[in-house]
Amino acid sequence: MNKLPKGWNFTIVDDNADSTNSENIQGKRPRRSRTSVQRSDGASPIIRDNIVLIRTDDNEEFKVGDTIEITQGKGPEDPTTEYGLITEIKFGNSEFIEVIVDWFIRSSEIVGMPNDFFADNELLLTPFRSEVKFIDFIRPINVLSESQFADVVIDESNSHSTFLVKRATDNEGNFSDIFDYKDFSGKVLENPKKCAIQVKELISTTVQKELLKEFSKEQRKKKANKVSTTGRVTRFNKRKESVSTKAIKPENKQVKIEIDNDVLSDQSEEKQEESDYNEAEDANSALESDEENISQESEDSEVEYSTKKKLKNKKLSRRSKAAATPSPKRKLQKKDIEDIYSVVTPTKRMKLGKDDRDSLPVFLSPTKSVPSEFTDPKSVAFKEVKQRLHTSQKLNALPGREDEFAMIYMNHESAVNEKTGCCVYVCGLPGMGKTATIKDVVEQMTYSSERGEMEQFSYLELNGLKLLSPTVAYEALWHHISGDKVSASNAALLLEEYFKREDHKRKPLVILMDEFDQIATKKQNVMYNFFNWPTYSTSKLIVIAVANTMDLPERMLTNKIASRLGLRRIQFRGYTFQQLGDIITHRLEMITKNNRRKVVITSDAIGFASRKVASVSGDARRALTICRRAVEIAEKEYLENKKGEDDSEPYQVLISHISTAINETVNSPLSKYIASLPFASKLVLASLLRRSRRTGLAENSLGDIIDEMRNSFAMATHSEEQGSDELNMQDVLYSDKTFTATNETVPILNLRIHFFKQIVTSLVEAGIIIQQNSPGETSRLVKLDVPEEEVVSVFKKDNAISQFL
């Protein structure tokens, strides 16, 4: 029916006429009235519907451009009260009149920001818009700019109806610069449908400015060197070319365009400068021969660090010095670097690699957003829920790790302020939040140092799984300190000399060594050096070692290394089901309110998933993966039954969806394959697991596994006397009694089970284990290539093999 709800009328306003024609329409649908609004910039006029909604109870009018208070609850005191800007009122298809609102967000709903960042009664614009029901309108509100708000006195009479707007934000935590809301609202009235686009432009412009500042810190210096080099080289050939640096310093109004041009023009500038440099070399070969000791060549050239470099010729011309290729960025003074190099290699040449440009930001063109008319609101909500439940999602806080956060923060804050070295060992099973907590601590320490609350420091992260070899850690650390790339052997000597030298200006260095058990070598010299350097009084080195087991220092490391590691050990225990529930709930609270009404994960479903995971491992990643998979299953059901669902009601993710997701993880193809293996293959895997736990090493030789199988089998089976015609499992696997007829009462047992080579080959081909390719069979190293939890969970359900674990 084309009728408005009871208590509501509407009026069509004609802007061209200076009068308002009001009609009480409850029957026949009127013709649409559209007016042309001339834009201030002289562009073509924009056509929009001028519909004014009237609430007959209090004769309150609502039109495009009004800021309103809206709720889906009982009234203004309801916690679901929100604020929005009406950007579109039109005749619709599903509803007689449809209203589109762009949303504000309260400053109190944003966590993780300083208390003095927001003003009282401040709202923030968001780029989110949705359709609402006008019967939920409460009242209009006053939204003022910063200058207007300063002239208003806020008291109890207007504290719920007068607000300040000077910033915009999005769901990624980005904020815009302070703007004048009065000017912004005037632009919105010209074309209200593009309000969300204008808000996105405000935020993106601010983000690009921040990236431009970081980009310009290094890029402008490099370009300045290139410009001076080009100008000086061309003087040799008497060429006068003006080099413009305007592209390096873009105006505020042209930030987006000039960034792209700046990046794209780098290669052409470099090529032009190289050609000018080659011409200068031909004309000034005599000068180059005099300056051979101070010029730095390209990537394959050699730089001589010797004591002779201190005796430089002061009369060398500036032209030839500038003609050299700009050297990579160094974090230390050039003289200090030369002193260290001269001590390590006083008469040798060392090759320095060219500094890479991986750290430079990449400017990508933004993707075009799909119009809201072609997207399903619930599909968008499902997408955001899955995004928030992803393990890589950045969080404002880490629930359940407050105590561990405080312990790590206190240790490192005291070490940085006192400028002393120390080692901290952090252990816990995978998925316990070790790395995330440490990164959160470093981020908070960085914020405190920027505000002057603690000393400045530098930070480096090393992951043992990402290093090609353990000695690469030396190269990465020296490159972080000096900017030079040298070999591992030279880097170790340079680092030893660097940390021994006393330098009062040196900042403390914090190193996170994640998966540090992967850098263990036979001599363990890499671990020894990294734990020995913090003991120097002049090092100012703080090492955070992260591994998975508590007793790893005693089991793997020698006494001299374990003693240097110290007694500062922080253990991350498994999450309880309450903590897992808090983690999932915290992520769901980050979803925008509009999408939060479309898709809901019930509290029973969250509790069921939390208890299931907490009873097994307490792994937060596993709990999030199960919930994310449950949302995917619920989304599939929604798309299949989309026609029969009521879009006004939220779609619920139930316990049944969680149970289906858990069954998929338990009954994975890998688990089914391991469960279907014969007993002999399971015995090989069980012996490999048992040997790995005994030695603490992931790789073990086949000879050790054969001995482990034989010993564990002898301990698990009984030794009662049996008749000559009876067979037991040991006879089947180890003796020839099964395949040959013998009269011996006690059969001779083989050293290995039958078809052992074929069993190992089949496991390798299936991808269950990895075997080293070496001539000696018993000395070949074997390693499990699948998650250990998968194998253990399957074997625990098998009564025949569980006793061998």
From Swiss-Prot:
Main location: nucleus
Positions with a binding annotation for Mg(2+): 514-515
One GO term (biological process): mitotic DNA replication checkpoint signaling
UniProt KW DNA-binding keyword: yes
SUPFAM superfamilies: BAH domain, P-loop containing nucleoside triphosphate hydrolases
Compartments where found: Nucleus
Residues annotated for ATP binding in this entry: 428-436, 515, 548, 621
InterPro entries tied to this protein: AAA_lid_10, ATPase_AAA_core, BAH_dom, BAH_sf, ORC1/CDC6, ORC1_wHTH, P-loop_NTPase
Feature: compositional bias, Basic and acidic residues: 239-259
Chain positions covered by the region annotation Disordered: 1-41, 223-334
Superkingdom as given in the UniProt entry: Eukaryota
Keywords per UniProt: ATP-binding, DNA replication, DNA-binding, Magnesium, Metal-binding, Nucleotide-binding, Nucleus
Domain BAH, chain residue ranges per copy: 60-180
Bias type Basic residues, positions: 308-321
Start-end of Acidic residues biased regions: 271-303
Any one GO CC term of the record: nuclear origin of replication recognition complex
GO molecular function list: ATP binding; ATP hydrolysis activity; chromatin binding; DNA replication origin binding; metal ion binding
Similarity comment: Belongs to the ORC1 family.
Biological role: Component of the origin recognition complex (ORC) that binds origins of replication. It has a role in both chromosomal replication and mating type transcriptional silencing. Binds to the ARS consensus sequence (ACS) of origins of replication in an ATP-dependent manner.
Assembly and oligomerization: ORC is composed of six subunits.
Protein's name in the database: Origin recognition complex subunit 1
Organism: Candida albicans
